[in-house]
Amino acid sequence: MAPGFHFSWLLVSWLVVTTVKGQDVMTPPGSQNNVNPTDCQIITLTPPPTTRNQLTRAQPVTRTPTFYFPPRRPGFYPRFPNIPFFPPNNRRFQLWPFYPPRGRLIPWRFFLGRRQLQSSSSEESLE
């Protein structure tokens, strides 16, 4: 069992049964519990609360404020990069994954190798 609060089902069931039945809790021997619940008279020392006049209502706001919040300054909106964020000096991630940029007009989209960029041997060389 996981460490933590342990309780007894017997204690919980006894507490539920005594609460439902409305019985008195077990009295220690030698003590007397012969008080009738209707013996005492409840006397309130505070006066009853005053009732409000029916004409007293919430007053409507007649003047509307011109603006609620101050105007926003031109802010700095950082873009989320499409690479994962790795904190510096992190030993778990030695190799950083490479994510090529997305888009149509990237320089190496159609020229992927060096062989395509070099001139062919059939061309005449300028001397």
Curated annotation (Swiss-Prot):
This chain's protein is named Odontogenesis-associated phosphoprotein
Taxonomic source organism: Rattus norvegicus
Question: Primary place of residence?
Answer: secreted
Q: Which cysteines are joined by disulfide bonds?
A: none
What residue stretch is flagged as signal peptide? 1-23
Q: Which UniProt keywords apply?
A: Secreted, Signal
- Output the GO biological process annotations, alphabetical, semicolon-separated: positive regulation of biomineral tissue development; positive regulation of enamel mineralization
Lineage, top ranks: Eukaryota, Metazoa, Chordata, Craniata, Vertebrata
Intracellular or extracellular location(s): Secreted
Q: What does this protein do?
A: May promote nucleation of hydroxyapatite.
Q: Which PANTHER family match?
A: ODONTOGENESIS ASSOCIATED PHOSPHOPROTEIN (PTHR40376:SF1)
